[in-house]
Swiss-Prot record:
Function as written in the Swiss-Prot or TrEMBL entry: Binds RNA and DNA sequences non-specifically. May be involved in tolerance to cold stress.
Organism from which the protein derives: Arabidopsis thaliana (Mouse-ear cress)
GO aspect biological process, one term: positive regulation of mRNA splicing, via spliceosome
Any GO molecular function: DNA binding
Main location: nucleus
Presence of keyword Plastid: no
Name by which UniProt lists this protein: Glycine-rich RNA-binding protein RZ1B
Induction remark: By cold stress. Down-regulated by dehydration.
Gene name of the record: RZ1B
Tissue expression: Expressed in roots, rosette and cauline leaves, stems, floral buds and flowers.
Length: 292
């Protein structure tokens, strides 16, 4: 008999969530009594605080009143907040009649066994029916359980970007410490900052500029145009051959005396005799038969 009464109350009992904190049971009853006779109207309060939890239960005398209330009041405003109205059903666990009358053993049908919104963690409504609008929507976008991770949600601050930036800076500091330790172990040879700044990865470092660069007049073509090493060798060989020719000319001038540089000093280059020319006739130009 008691179970049959509970089943009858269950069919005519509705769950009202998203209630404003200042809505009273009398206001709630006067709002829903147009859809049928109400036998019970309760707003749930906290056991420890005694404050309203934002939801309540209404029991009609028949099922039709409950259905009409759900049809016309679900998603409407009450006390400047949008409310949700659904069928109420007892939680699994076999509560007695007194617990059902207190409302502690009921939840909205089709919504699971929890009576809190996972968005704002407020009781009395579900995520899809969350009445938070305007600033409240921004404030309760993240569950309250994550507030300790994010920071000041009430101040509309999102510190994920700051945390990522700080994490990136910490990685850079760790890398700097690693490279400094490696440089210390290797005797200062591997300074990654110096290596990347200089642009030459394998060339040795000189203490003075003249040790690295020759005077402008002695620079080779390969230095200006980045020629390979074998071109540099050809340049050196050419300079050696030029040096050998100059030394041969000096030896020849010393050997023949008057054919040395002193005799040709001040004369144009074309008028100077070649290394195999006979001495020119006095006052004349050497002829072709004088060469051998």
């Amino acid at each position: 008999m008691k179970d049959r009464e509970n089943d009858g109350n269950l069919e005519s009992r509705i769950f009202v969530g998203g209630l404003s904190w200042d809505v009273t049971e009398r206001q709630l009853e006067s709002t829903f009594d147009r859809y049928g006779k109400i036998t019970e109207c309760q707003i749930m309060v906290g056991r420890d605080t005694g404050r309203p939890r934002g939801f309540g239960f209404i029991t009609f005398t028949d099922r039709r009143g409950a259905d009409d209330a759900i049809k016309h009041m679900h998603g409407r405003e009450l006390g400047n907040k949008v409310i949700s109205v659904n069928k109420a059903e007892p939680k699994v666990g076999g509560e007695d009649v007194d617990q059902l009358k207190k409302g502690g053993g009921y939840s909205s049908r089709g919504k699971g066994t929890e009576d809190e919104c996972f968005k704002c963690r407020r009781p009395g409504h579900w995520a899809r029916d969350c009445p938070s609008t305007g600033d409240d929507r921004e404030r309760f976008r993240v569950p309250l359980a994550m507030r300790s991770r994010i920071g000041d949600i009430d101040g509309h601050r999102d510190r994920y970007g700051d945390r990522d930036l700080e994490r990136e800076r910490e990685r850079e500091r760790e890398f700097d410490r690693y490279m400094d330790g490696r440089r210390d172990r290797d005797g200062g040879r591997y300074s990654y900052r110096d290596r990347f700044d200089s642009g030459d990865k394998y060339e040795p470092r000189d203490h003075y500029p003249f040790e690295r660069y020759a005077p402008p007049g002695d620079r080779f073509v390969s230095d200006r145009y980045g020629m390979p090493e074998h071109h540099l060798e050809n340049e050196y060989r050419g300079r050696e051959r030029s040096y050998d020719r100059d030394r041969y000319a000096r030896d020849t001038s010393d050997r023949y005396g008057d054919m040395g540089p002193i005799r040709d000093e001040g004369r144009p280059y074309r008028s100077r005799p070649g290394p195999y020319d006979r001495p020119s006739r006095p006052g004349g130009r050497p002829s072709s038969y004088e060469r051998w």
